[in-house]
């Protein structure tokens, strides 16, 4: 249950980041998580690339895919007067991503070795190091997002661009760059979460459905509120 809470929190952080920096809800967010699991499987199992090289390739892929996702979903409809356009586009993107995952890696769930092997025993309880690793990553991400939006100029610039792009451009904020950076960061967060999930829940397209808990968490905790998301994810 604790690990489920941590994974929900990591996914909620990605949603909050996109809401606060771009002002949109991404219904393909869960599929970005599944992409992280499939990317880990593709690199480490199908091509047998391990260690630091695999980590670098994964991070580069997540950043590049985030930029690609922004240019193909958000950017073409950013000026439309139909407010639901982006929601419809992300739902369509979700379907496309699922089909591509099955086309490239197959439709059967795949197993993958834990990123951090081993376990620690405490009485009758056995805790895998993979779970401890997940807890540590979740803590780092939570602090990083909080610092970004509450302490750094870059985060405030992202929030300003989300609230009023025209006014943000007038004071010199590069709105295209802030939006691109946001999508790259969100894709990386979701991809890392998916890679962490893969050894524990298998590599499968249904990982995308995990995002529903995160939607519920941010609704209960208040849109864009990290502290509220922590409570809501519980």
Report residues per predicted region.
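Hydrophobic core segments of alpha-helical transmembrane domains in multi-pass membrane transport
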Residues: 37-41, 59-65, 93-101, 137-146, ...
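Short loop segments and helix-boundary regions at transmembrane helix junctions
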Residues: 20-25, 64-108, 151, 208, ...
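Helix-loop-helix "hairpin" substructures at the membrane interface of multi-pass membrane proteins
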Residues: 126-206, 226-232
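Membrane-interfacial amphipathic/re-entrant helices at transmembrane-helix boundaries
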Residues: 1-11, 39, 48-54, 80-87, ...
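Membrane-embedded helix boundary and interhelical linker motif in transport proteins
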Residues: 21-68, 72
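Short, non-helical or kinked segments that cap or interrupt transmembrane helices
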Residues: 15-37, 51, 80-85, 154-157, ...
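Residue-level signature of the transmembrane alpha-helical core
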Residues: 1, 5, 9, 35, ...
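Transmembrane helix-bundle core of multi-pass membrane transporters
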Residues: 77, 81-151, 177-181
